[in-house]
C-alpha cells in the first residue's frame, strides 16, 4: 500500500493508541501522519501523555477511520525509530498554525516504522 497516496487522498479521523512501560493505555486524536518513506511516518507530538508513553514503550497503533458510510480505514502498527526536538525541523512539518495552544513550542517530531497494516475492521489476512 502506498501510504503517501492513501493519506493525501483520504479524509478521516486519526487516533493514536500508546501504552506506558506498565501497559497503561491511552488514545488520542491526531492529524494525518507525515509519510516520510515507504514504511515510515512521522507525527508531531506535544508534551502530553502519548509522547511520554512513546518515550517508555516504542510501540503504538495509529487507527484511521475514513469519512463516509460503513467502516473503512486502516490500522498502522508502529514502532518509534527516532525523535526530533529541533523546533525549526518540527515547524517544517506543520501543515497549519493554530497559535501556541499549549506545548506547541515544545512539540517533538516522532518517526515511526510501520511494521504492519491492517484494515479498520477484520484481520485482513
Give a label for each model feature.
Residues 1-125:
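Binding-site signature for planar aromatic cofactors or substrates
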Amino acid at each position: 500500500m502506498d501510504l503517501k497516496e492513501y493519506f493525501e487522498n483520504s479524509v478521516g479521523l486519526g487516533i493514536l493508541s500508546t501504552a506506558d512501560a506498565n501497559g497503561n493505555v491511552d488514545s488520542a486524536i491526531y492529524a494525518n501522519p507525515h509519510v516520510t518513506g515507504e514504511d515510515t511516518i512521522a507525527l508531531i507530538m506535544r508534551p502530553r501523555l502519548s509522547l511520554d508513553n512513546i518515550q517508555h514503550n516504542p510501540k503504538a497503533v495509529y487507527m484511521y477511520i475514513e469519512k463516509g458510510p460503513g467502516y473503512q480505514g486502516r490500522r498502522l502498527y508502529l514502532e518509534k525509530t527516532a525523535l526530533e526536538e529541533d523546533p525549526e525541523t518540527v515547524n517544517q512539518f506543520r501543515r497549519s498554525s493554530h497559535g501556541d495552544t499549549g506545548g506547541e513550542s515544545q512539540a517533538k517530531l516522532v518517526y515511526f516504522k510501520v511494521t504492519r497494516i491492517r484494515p479498520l475492521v477484520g484481520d485482513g489476512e
